């Protein structure tokens, strides 16, 4: 299917919220990880979200220049071509972008989509994320207001992170502590600044103990029930049921119960990166260990071309990551819910 239009993306999010499921949002760093994500969605009969972080975009831009916009645009254009061959619908999204990278990433990408829309085309990306969690809430929301207006003009949805997610994501680091929980006051101020849809649709990455990366059980206390408190507080104030479209960050390693509670409380998008990175790399490591004397030229031998051919181990990597995407779609209840 073609990449989602703005109208289709809104329909996807509406369906997820009404059906209490969420889309896996899979970080990709290459054409191969893109195909792995698309394959996983297709095998799950699930629509989904493909996302590119600042680090991923820089990597995609090549190690010679390391240009984030070049990398993001190149993969997005590639995705528009190859996604049409899969019988599912995906939206393209850019992941965490802090203040010091806005001018080199999100703002130029917004401008590119605005130009496309002015010509009667669809935007290149369907949503962008502004991560102002390292800023004061006042500064965070002021920048969010500016970006939301630009996003609306380009027919794009903005994702906003108002409070920190723990751990490290592309150089943005937050300690694991009590600051990892969004308060009612935080969302009151967010609703006052950004509205509840009348100024433009946005996705809200609220914090309920989330942590990026890998962590041992017991080190992190997730409280997805907090999302219900936030929904109800603002809903009562504005007379709207479940006013927020929530995003679940730092979702790798979450329990089935934690995910289910988050879905019941308005999560429509859940990010996966750490788990899919491992799922992609693990089969490659296995192949290298099992075939080291073919991959390497050992003891004067010449190795075996079919063992070090990137296509050989690349197919294993794609299959491994696709299986993890399929598993995510099942956990998030999006499996079998593709648009038809």
Q: Which residues make up each language-model segment?
A:
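Short, conserved beta-strand segments within well-ordered enzyme catalytic domains
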Residues: 25-27, 49-51, 91-93
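Extended, intrinsically disordered, low-complexity segments
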Residues: 290-340
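Glycine- and other small-residue-rich loops at beta-strand/loop junctions that grip anionic moieties
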Residues: 26-27, 133, 176-179, 216-219, ...
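N-terminal amphipathic alpha-helix/helix-capping segment at the start of soluble metabolic enzymes
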Residues: 1-24
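Catalytic-face loop-and-helix region of soluble metabolic enzyme cores
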Residues: 83-84, 211, 216, 226, ...
